[in-house]
Each structure stands twice: as structure tokens, then as C-alpha cells.
């Protein structure tokens, strides 16, 4: 009886550990210069236009400048 109880508890412990590892692996952060979303956040910096960057820079083209 004791062997059966021990094996069942070990089996349940393995299932719990596997579930925890799955949560940790799916919630990990994205390194810099990689694709990011709101569900996959950046490790450092912010998600700018789908890429992890240290800070978001706004790039303006020729059409965005005002000329008199």
C-alpha cells in the first residue's frame, strides 16, 4: 500500500512540474532585435513596431517635415 501511494504521489508531482515548466517556457521574454507582441514581451526595452528595442525612436521621412 505504501509503495502504491508513493508511486502515485511521484506521478502527480511529475505532472505538476511539467505544467510549471510549460508555463515558464511560454511566458519567457524576447531578446533585443527579435519579433515581439503584447503576449511575448521584451526582456529589456520596449516593443516598437514589432521589434524589441532599447527605446522607441520616431522616424520621420521627407513628407513629414514642414517646408515653407
Curated annotation (Swiss-Prot):
The modification Tyrosine amide is found at residue 60. It holds the Pfam family Conotoxin_I2. Expressed by the venom duct. InterPro entries: Conotoxin-I_CS, Conotoxin_I2. Disulfide bonds join 29-43, 36-48, 42-52, 47-56. It is found in: Secreted. It comes from the Eukaryota. Keywords: Amidation, Cleavage on pair of basic residues, Disulfide bond, Secreted, Signal, Toxin. One of its GO terms (molecular function) is toxin activity. This is conotoxin S11.3. Residues 64-68 form a propeptide. GO terms for cellular component: extracellular region. Residues 1-26 form the signal peptide.
Amino acid at each position: 500500500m505504501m509503495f502504491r501511494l508513493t508511486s502515485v504521489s511521484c506521478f502527480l508531482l511529475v505532472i505538476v512540474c511539467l505544467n510549471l515548466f510549460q508555463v515558464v517556457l511560454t511566458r519567457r521574454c524576447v531578446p533585443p532585435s527579435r519579433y515581439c507582441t503584447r503576449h511575448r514581451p521584451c526582456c529589456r526595452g520596449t516593443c516598437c513596431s514589432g521589434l524589441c528595442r532599447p527605446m522607441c525612436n520616431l522616424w520621420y521621412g521627407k513628407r513629414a517635415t514642414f517646408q515653407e
